[in-house]
From Swiss-Prot:
Gene: ydiU
Function: Nucleotidyltransferase involved in the post-translational modification of proteins. It can catalyze the addition of adenosine monophosphate (AMP) or uridine monophosphate (UMP) to a protein, resulting in modifications known as AMPylation and UMPylation.
MF (Gene Ontology): AMPylase activity; ATP binding; magnesium ion binding
Keyword Disulfide bond: no
Protein name listed in UniProt: Protein nucleotidyltransferase YdiU
UniProt xrefs under InterPro entries: SelO
Binding locations of ATP: G90, G92, R93, K113, D125, G126, R176, R183, D262
Keyword terms, alphabetized: ATP-binding, Magnesium, Manganese, Metal-binding, Nucleotide-binding, Nucleotidyltransferase, Transferase
Length: 487
């Protein structure tokens, strides 16, 4: 394991030149304090755990100090926001400090969010507030623990620096780790500004650095795009299967790697509601829970447009057409596993859709239903869960079909089924009210709850003694919390 001053940098994106990013130094925040750190994320850099306890750690990730090999850059990109094209966005408050590589040869971007003003800040102050930084940290690490591809979060550092949003708050910085920060909107920018050479350079960078195996194919860019489609189909299937709502699926928030990226007004479902909108600015529900699948396909079409100089329109359309069947296959596989089933059958889609309809009509807690279904032998669990449903007759019909489905598989014991289900059905998820409790304490200078919640979320499938309070439905005040893009 390494000390902070032993990180090795190889800043490949910075070497692309000033057309792709701008050299900017961070604006430090005052009296920095470490709020929370993720040892598993920092281990990606081979950093020793005790490094987070050093004063130097908070100084670096609050903008006060910098490695001599780092080359902080603000990246330029554009994007479709709520369906409308915005020609110039870019890192308005974040900096790509550099790319460090570990002993395994993996490159990781170190991106400091809340690092101050850049040429792309427009009218903003370049700051991130403590609450949004904590939310991004917790979401990144919670999704990773659930097995959902995501950028990682190394730490959050707080400060006494005041910033104004709806009220006065305090600035913070969050360290984001990802193997690339290239977005769909990065390629869109060079396509729509008619910079073909720069577009080709960026496309080659993505292909060479992140999809090198595609170079062996007859049409490398088509092979790369197909893999991007495949990765996004699997990603969105996991979002839907685990009840995650992103909230702002603009193309500038879509990673070229097919990972969850740029956390804003996200939420996990409490009660199952396919029409759930987690962003109170999304008045038309464009990014509602049920719309995430078609929006992901729409975003892939937007990316495809930027790739037309390299791939035929016909091939792009054919590849985009693979998204829905790939998504459906991944989603049904995940839902089978959540139900403890091991064999695919034609009626599985109906079994899942009927259950979700019953849950929708009864306001059943999405996460706890699946967990409790695996807590007992199936017949006993169904009798216990029956009281949660308004349509008792409908639920009894579904339960009968489910029991017949289990019996038809004839594989293993009830205990084996329960073990399988507990391995894929979390007991703990990042509910908005849990995040809000942690944020409220942190804003008073108490970081113990943020750290405790982080530790609970790191092992979501394992029951943790004394942590029963983190596996409860939200109290009345915690239901339907409205989260804005203000951060």
């Amino acid at each position: 394991m390494k000390a902070l001053d032993e990180l090795i940098f190889d800043n490949r994106f910075a070497r692309l030149g000033d057309a792709f990013s701008t050299s900017v130094l961070s604006e430090p925040i005052e009296t920095p304090r470490l709020v929370v750190a993720s040892q598993s994320a920092l281990a990606l850099l081979d950093l020793a755990p005790e490094q987070a306890d050093l004063p130097l750690f908070a100084e670096i990730f609050s903008g006060h100090k910098l490695w001599s090999e780092a080359e902080p850059r603000a990246m330029v990109y554009s994007g479709h926001q709520f369906g409308s094209y915005n020609p110039r966005l870019g890192d308005g408050r974040g900096l790509l400090l550099g790319e460090a590589y570990n002993d395994a040869g993996e490159h990781w971007d170190l991106h400091l969010k809340g690092a101050g003003r850049t040429p792309y800040s427009r009218m903003g102050d370049g700051r991130a507030v403590l609450r949004s930084s904590i939310r991004e940290f917790l979401a990144s690490e919670a999704l990773h623990a659930l097995g959902i591809p995501s950028s990682r979060a190394g730490c959050v550092v707080s400060s006494s620096t005041p910033v104004w949003r709806e009220t006065q708050e305090h600035a913070a910085m969050v360290l984001r780790l990802a193997q690339s920060h290239v977005r769909f909107g990065s390629l869109e920018y060079f396509f729509y500004t008619k910079q073909p050479e720069q577009l080709k350079t960026l496309a080659e960078h993505v292909l060479t650095m992140h999809y090198p195996h595609c170079q062996e194919q007859p049409e490398p860019y088509l092979a790369m795009f197909r893999e991007i489609v495949e990765r996004n189909a699997e990603l969105i299937a996991k979002w839907q299967a685990y009840g995650f709502c992103h909230g702002v699926m603009n193309t500038d928030n879509m990673s070229i790697l097919g990972i969850t990226f740029d956390f804003g007004p996200f939420a996990f479902l409490d009660d199952f509601d396919e029409h759930f909108i987690c962003n109170h600015s999304d008045h038309e529900g464009r990014y509602s829970f049920s719309n995430q699948v078609p929006i992901a396909q729409w975003n892939l079409s937007a990316l495809a447009q930027a790739l037309t100089p390299f791939i035929s329109v016909e091939a792009l359309r054919e590849t985009i057409g693979l998204f829905l069947p790939l998504y459906q296959a991944h989603y049904l596989d995940l839902m089978r596993r959540r139900l403890g089933l091991t064999i695919a059958q034609e009626q599985d889609e109906q079994l899942v859709s009927q259950l979700l309809k019953l849950m929708q009509n009864s306001g059943v807690d999405y996460t706890l239903f699946f967990r409790r279904l695996g807590d007992q032998p199936a017949a006993e669990a169904l009798r216990t869960l029956r009281d949660d449903f308004v349509d008792i007759k409908g639920f009894d019909g579904w339960a009968e079909a489910y029991l017949a489905r289990i019996a038809g598989e004839g594989k293993g014991t009830e205990q084996e089924r329960q073990t399988r289900m507990h391995a894929v059905n979390p007991l703990y998820i990042l509910r908005n009210y849990l995040a809000q409790n942690a944020i409220a304490a942190a804003e008073k200078g108490d970081y113990a709850e943020v750290r405790r919640l982080h530790q609970v979320l790191c092992t979501p499938f394992t029951e943790q003694p004394g942590m029963e309070g983190y596996a409860q439905r939200p109290p009345d005040w915690g239901k339907h919390l409205e989260i804005s893009c203000s951060s």
